[in-house]
């Protein structure tokens, strides 16, 4: 999300945590269980308010202009010509199921152009309003930066439709130089791919227009700048425009590795030494999974903290007594002049919103495109179905009732954050209560999907407007149901874990009452601390707390 802070080779610098943001996963239609193309995205940025964006379909006057504001800051950048017609966009998917996500890789800082008009966020939402296919979106985005200039630092974009998925990587040409250098590679249908704030495209085919597109000067510009001097066939976009450093490896590529490791154990084992900086062979842009992948699999992947791998962060002192899989920002720290770091997992507390986009070619667009969406950290919220035809925002996902500094009990973002911030400090004690509610809701939405879509498809064949209204209402209902359930969960957690103890419950989950009717104290359990944590306290304090 935010421009990436440049890292020194072999060491992370202090304060980098706030800049290393966002993760994208991609699943080709031949790699998914049901033939869906799947794209996931977490918008990870401290201070960003999590909301669902909506741009209604519209017709525009011939000479209409559009004002462009930087997505991150709201800064006015300039104006561009408006398209005659723009399409309905809900979140990061449009009415034709075209979906776009991103991660910022930053790259060479000297290539930033402060005079450019198109920032990465505007590229996403303008392209969604103007494109019917992924390839068309790539053309819209690259044409826009060519005509109006590119304002942001280096970006990786996931661009997909019901039939194909691409990764587009782009970086500017420097101050006052209009345009960008870029390359786009199609992900094979039977493969999965990922990017996470480090440029991922190395060598690419120079003569395969069906599967690879690139700017005419992507190699020659690198030669002019002194970034590359070899043969064209050996050119690596990533090496030229975003040389890998320790931060890019351990805070960024490690998330890609974790995703690959989940779905292809051989690849996980092969590239673990690369992540540990023991070997230099980079991971491929895409791999084949061991088994077909589902939407629920990708939802779970977005909740990953390296559990069960050598990068697991739940078993050291930083996890505290209750195995918290999070670390506070910044991720780097210094002790006696030596710099250290904490791992940066896929799931992280600063996520504003996360989605898993499901695109299907065997259904009408209005029914086939589902943005499984939630605000806050994927691990601590519920993915609810948002159909791409939705033409009205669920109130709980709207910025009209709350913002980044305005709390509301009606806001999904603040309700999810409220509960998450209670759970994290005592994670292992409390997480099962949250997971039970989360699983129940997501199981319900998954089980209902086929029936809802069958009914919607039948409606669509007779009256498309009726189907759109039906799916819009369903989108609103499921979002609100999740928020209402989360409020009750928060109330339950406050009561159950008040004052550091655990109130006892009956078999049906209700709280035990005092033994006598006039009693005022509920039965409680005093959990204390795990044995391993107590042993660490004794090691650190010696006889300080010894009982004589």
Where on the chain are the PLM-derived regions?
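Short, well-ordered beta-strand elements within core beta-sheets of diverse protein domains
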Residues: 124-130
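Histidine-centered catalytic/metal-binding microenvironments
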Residues: 438-548
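Glycine-rich, aromatic-lined ligand/substrate-binding cores of catalytic
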Residues: 221-374
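Sec/Tat signal peptide C-region and signal peptidase I cleavage site
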Residues: 15-21
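Sec-dependent N-terminal signal peptides
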Residues: 5-15
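A contiguous strand-loop segment
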Residues: 22-120, 140-293
């Amino acid at each position: 999300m935010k421009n990436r802070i440049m890292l020194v080779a072999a060491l992370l610098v202090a304060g980098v945590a706030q800049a290393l943001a966002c993760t994208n996963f991609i699943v080709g239609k031949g790699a998914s269980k049901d033939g869906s193309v799947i794209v996931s995205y977490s918008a990870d940025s401290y201070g960003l308010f999590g909301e669902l964006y909506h741009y209604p379909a519209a017709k525009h006057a011939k000479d209409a202009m559009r004002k462009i504001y930087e997505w991150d800051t709201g800064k006015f950048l300039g104006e561009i010509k408006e398209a005659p017609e723009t399409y309905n966009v809900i979140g990061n998917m449009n009415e034709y199921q075209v979906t776009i996500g991103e991660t910022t890789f930053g790259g060479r800082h000297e290539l930033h152009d402060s005079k450019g008009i198109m920032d990465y966020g505007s590229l996403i939402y303008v392209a969604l309003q103007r494109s019917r296919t992924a390839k068309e979106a790539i053309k819209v985005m690259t044409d826009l930066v060519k005509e109006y200039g590119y304002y942001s630092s280096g970006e990786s974009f996931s661009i997909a439709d019901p039939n194909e998925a691409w990764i587009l990587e782009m970086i500017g040409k420097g101050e006052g130089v209009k345009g960008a250098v870029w390359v786009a590679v199609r992900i094979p249908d039977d493969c999965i791919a990922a990017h996470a704030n480090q440029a991922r495209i190395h060598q690419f085919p120079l003569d395969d227009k069906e599967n690879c597109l690139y700017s005419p000067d992507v190699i020659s510009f690198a030669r002019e700048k002194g970034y590359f001097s070899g043969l064209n066939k050996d050119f690596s976009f990533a090496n030229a425009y975003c040389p890998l450093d320790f931060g890019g490896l351990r805070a960024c590529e490690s998330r890609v590795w974790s995703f690959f490791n989940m779905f292809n154990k051989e690849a996980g084992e092969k590239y673990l030494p690369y992540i540990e900086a023991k070997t230099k062979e980079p991971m491929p842009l895409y791999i084949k999974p061991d088994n077909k992948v589902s939407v629920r699999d990708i939802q779970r992947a977005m909740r990953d903290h390296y559990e069960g791998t050598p990068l697991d962060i739940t078993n050291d002192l930083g996890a505290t007594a209750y195995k918290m899989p999070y670390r506070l920002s910044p991720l780097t720290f210094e002790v006696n002049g030596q710099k250290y770091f904490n791992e940066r997992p896929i799931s992280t507390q600063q996520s504003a919103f996360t989605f898993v986009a499901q695109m299907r070619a065997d259904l009408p667009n209005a029914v086939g495109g589902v943005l499984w969406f939630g605000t806050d950290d994927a691990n601590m919220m519920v993915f609810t179905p948002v159909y791409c035809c939705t033409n009205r925002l669920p109130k709980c996902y709207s910025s009209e009732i709350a913002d980044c500094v305005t709390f509301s009990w009606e806001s999904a973002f603040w309700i999810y954050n409220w509960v998450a911030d209670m759970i994290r400090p005592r994670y292992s004690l409390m997480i099962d209560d949250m997971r039970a509610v989360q699983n129940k809701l997501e199981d319900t939405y998954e089980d209902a999907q086929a029936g809802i879509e069958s009914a919607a498809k039948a409606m669509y064949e007779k009256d498309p407007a009726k189907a759109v209204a039906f799916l819009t209402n369903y989108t609103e209902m499921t979002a609100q149901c999740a928020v209402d359930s989360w409020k009750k969960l928060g109330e339950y957690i406050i009561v159950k874990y008040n004052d550091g103890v655990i109130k006892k419950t009956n078999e049906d989950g209700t709280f035990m009452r005092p033994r006598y009717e006039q009693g005022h104290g509920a039965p409680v359990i005093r959990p204390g601390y795990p044995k391993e944590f107590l042993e660490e306290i004794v090691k650190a304090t010696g006889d300080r707390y010894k009982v004589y």
